[in-house]
């Protein structure tokens, strides 16, 4: 399946579920779609082959998710070795990966998957406490149940302590034996993100100037390499998607438009700082010269500058 068609399918599933969706068209970007609802915020990377996601893209995707208390997700149709199975969760760099059919079942049908793929096959996590209660209720010793399931006593005890995943084959035997569901669903919409938010490391002299000024204003700055913006600048509840360019180009304008689209979905403002530029607004994202940023005294003044420029452009429309 072509990637563009796949992105369109995923976007339609998201919209059908009632989420607001923005598309980001950036070569090599860490996410392609951002979707939000009342209790849901997703940053999604869409690829045909989930093994083509790079470690750098994954780290940026996880940073965004952690900063916005969102869920990162990869949607694809195959790995380098096989098709992605419906109803099965895969994982790449600590991010859940699934196919569009599974995403549909989660968002539209409210059905959370329980099966995940790892080297060696398909597995589930089970409720170990429930397994122990069922074993005791049916009068099985550890050895007897282990023998019935075809596993070692040690493995069975690990299952009961929630210390070991269970192969799908063994889990099905358990559920058939006890006539009760034991597998724990995987809440792919509430995934925990494990990533370190390192201090921003500038790649250009202009980035260094901008980052230093933002830090001087009391903002935390997190560098994001594979997104329409260069960094996330944050102070308390204020977050600014911050773009940096030497001068205004077609690429700058397109990036600003994408920042505006993303900002509308996640309720966050944007700002582009250029080496030299007149003050203007592109799709409600202000473009300002670095000299104007240097004159700012605090975060409140920066926000007022951004909002003031947006008000001016609205009046002129």
UniProtKB/Swiss-Prot annotation:
Alphabetized UniProt keyword annotations: DNA-binding, Transcription, Transcription regulation
Q: Which GO terms describe its molecular function?
A: DNA binding; DNA-binding transcription factor activity
Which superkingdom? Archaea
| Coiled-coil residue windows | none
Which ranges of the sequence are annotated as binding DNA? 142-161
InterPro entries assigned = Arc_TR_HTH, Cro/C1-type_HTH, Lambda_DNA-bd_dom_sf, Restrct_endonuc-II-like
Domain called HTH cro/C1-type: residue spans:
131-189
Q: Which CDD domains match?
A: HTH_XRE
Residues of the signal peptide: none
Write one Pfam family the protein is assigned to: HTH_3
Q: What is this protein called?
A: Putative HTH-type transcriptional regulatory protein TGAM_1316
Species assigned in the record: Thermococcus gammatolerans (strain DSM 15229 / JCM 11827 / EJ3)
